[in-house]
Amino acid sequence: MIELMHGDCLELMKDVPDQSVDMILCDLPYGTTACKWDTVIPFEPLWAQYKRVIKRNGAVALFGSEPFSTLLRMSNLAQFKYDWIWDKVRPSGFQIAKYVPMKRHEIVSVFCNATLNWNPQKEKRDKPIKGRVCSSSDSSPLAHNDGVVRTYDDKNPQSILVYSKQSDGKYVHPTQKPVALMEYLIRTYTHEGETVLDNCMGSGTTGVACMNTGRKFIGMEQDAKYFEIAQKRIHDSIDLPDWLK
């Protein structure tokens, strides 16, 4: 299921049924620029809708940057759980680097009314084998062969997520996030077939990530230009036979 809506998200969310959403994943406007689309949504009516539509154990994961993130956390401190730090690899702020450090990170604040649905995405890591050791899966001895590499799937998630923000011209929105980062967060808090809501979807990256991971998606965007871009990006990401596209 894909449902894309154009308009004011505070009005559009009123049509979303109670407790029908498994995760809210949104890059809200931070209010740090003079751009028309970068206007902070009032927290009180926003949380009223979020709390109504999200399921009891569903995650509300919201991107931010200071000072916006502090205001966001304080707007619902009772349900705040923790922050992820997104390491963008490519820093921004070169123009003002003589006054402040260049910024290489953004924040993802996670909220929930109860115990979070949690599917930790364990990272694969390579470890060279030296000498005679046993397999962790079947206790069978492995041959002496220094330099052999085995892959382990047991590195627990850490609070810093490293996903490079491309600079190759593929970005169509100034605050567009990497698809892989959104996929990681979606897999962490939902299962296949569950529903993700993005009420400020911009160019549709969350929707693309949902299509790639087999999730249902509800997307909302007020800007007509970006709504059209999001529609096309999400449609193009659907794996359909050519005759259905």
Spans of features found by a protein language model:
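Core catalytic lobe of class I
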Residues: 1-220, 225-229, 245
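Short, conserved SAM-binding/catalytic segment
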Residues: 231-244
